[in-house]
Every structure is written in structure tokens, then in C-alpha cells.
Swiss-Prot record:
One of its GO terms (cellular component) is membrane. Ubiquitinated; a fraction of P12I is degraded via the ubiquitin system. This is Accessory protein p12I. p12I is a modulator of T-lymphocyte proliferation and immune function and may contribute to establish a persistent infection. Binds and down-modulates cell surface expression of interleukin-2 receptors IL2RB and IL2RG. Also down-modulates cell surface MHC-I molecules by binding to free immature MHC-I heavy chains in the ER and targeting them to the proteasome for degradation. Binding to IL2RB mediates recruitment of JAK1 and JAK3. As a result of this interaction, p12I increases DNA-binding and transcriptional activity of STAT5. It is found in: Host endoplasmic reticulum membrane; Host Golgi apparatus, Host cis-Golgi network membrane. The keyword Membrane applies. GO terms for biological process: symbiont-mediated suppression of host antigen processing and presentation of peptide antigen via MHC class I. Its main location: host cell. Belongs to the HTLV-1 accessory protein p12I family. It comes from Human T-cell leukemia virus 1 (isolate Caribbea HS-35 subtype A). A motif (SH3-binding) lies at residues 4-11, 33-38, 70-77, 88-93.
Amino acid sequence: MLFRLLSPLSPLALTALLLFLLSPGEVSGLLLRPLPAPCLLLFLPFQILSNLLFLLFLPLFFSLPLLLSPSLPITMRFPARWRFPPWRAPSQPAAAFLF
């Protein structure tokens, strides 16, 4: 239950949550802004890309305390698919024991 509560949100869910928290006037203001100056048009793709990357990595910051907490055993912090590379997968009884 704790893992479901602390599981990271997808960037799409975070965006929807932000739009839900904004008032309708703020949302329409975001959508109906005038076009920026031509010198800023070169900067705009980089800003959009950085915003998308921020939204992509934002869930990682929510899960970092959970992943790095020493109180949880390593089998709960890191699933077996993260601990074993595919070419060195453990035998089936060992894999069943780890879960």
C-alpha cells in the first residue's frame, strides 16, 4: 500500500494535475498568449525540451527517498530485474526466492 501511495506519477498525470489546480482564467491565459519576439523563437524549442525533460525526470525525485532508504531490505528497494542483467539472470528457484 505504501508503494502505491509513493509511486511516481507520470508526467502526463502531473500536467493534468497542474491544469486542474489552475483557475480557468490562468489556463486560457497560458493558451492565448501573444507570440514572442522573433529572437525568442530560437530559444523556445530549447525551453520546451527542458520543460519536457523536467516533467520526465520529476517522478524520479519522488521515488528517490524510497529507493535510498536503508530501512527497507534490498529486495524491496530494487526489484530483481534491476539487480540482475538479462544475460546473467539467476536460476529459477533463486528468482522465486527473491520475490
